[in-house]
From Swiss-Prot:
The gene is plsY1. SMART domains: G3P_acyltransf. One of its GO terms (biological process) is phospholipid biosynthetic process. The chain crosses the membrane at residues 5-25, 52-72, 81-101, 111-131, 138-158. NCBIfam families: glycerol-3-phosphate 1-O-acyltransferase PlsY. InterPro entries: G3P_acylTferase_PlsY (IPR003811). This is Glycerol-3-phosphate acyltransferase 1. Pfam families: G3P_acyltransf.
Length: 198
């Protein structure tokens, strides 16, 4: 591993670790970790603060994934390192040192990574995940479905091995991060889209 690659990985992790949801909520006088699901992500911001702040957070979180991959490319690193930098950004988002190694579930940041690695895969996954979310009214169901769609498509599309490995890892991590949501969906206690925190 070269010093450049090591620097890119570290910077990617730190970019991903920027807790946009937590910091924006704090500026509004809210501790996002103590309301709703306690998750530092756009969905919890939507329920706690509304559409505008949620859109800002989602956009920033997507950008984190995009920037990590572009950083590796700008530094002249290979496609393998670019994919790994994307993964590190999502890990940073999910396990941020700024939030005692807690964070979000990585949906938006994973989308940013996948979209920059393979725009067709990213767009297809996004459209189908949004459709699932709209039909079920569950954000978590759309996110989980998106993970399965991305994982399935990357296995059949002609993609480099490292891109394929990165997408499969991100899909598996996203499903794991939603394990509590899966339990709530099974129990019928998951909040639907549009429900405010009590």
């Amino acid at each position: 591993m070269t010093l450049t690659a090591l620097l890119a990985l570290l910077l990617s992790y730190l970019i991903g670790a920027i807790p946009a949801a937590a910091w924006l909520a704090r500026a509004r006088g809210v501790d996002i970790r103590k309301v709703g699901s306690g998750n530092s992500g756009a969905t919890n911001v939507l329920r706690s603060l509304g559409k505008g702040p949620a859109l800002l957070v989602a956009s920033f979180d997507i950008l984190k994934g995009v920037l990590a991959v572009l950083l590796a490319r700008a530094l002249g690193l290979s496609a393998e390192w670019a994919a790994l930098c994307g993964v590190l950004a999502v890990i940073g988002h999910n396990f941020s040192p700024f939030l005692a190694f807690r964070g979000g579930k990585g949906v938006a940041t994973s989308f940013g990574v996948i979209a920059i690695l393979d725009p067709v895969l990213g767009l297809t996954t996004f459209v189908l995940a949004i459709a699932c979310m709209w039909l079920t009214r569950f954000v978590s169901a759309g996110s989980i479905m998106g993970a399965f769609i991305a994982g399935a498509l990357v296995l059949v599309l002609p993609r480099p091995t490292w891109d394929r490995a990165a997408v499969l890892f991100l899909a598996a991590l996203l499903v794991w991060q939603h394990r509590e949501n899966i339990r709530k969906l099974q129990a019928g206690t998951e909040r639907r889209l549009g429900e405010k925190v009590s």
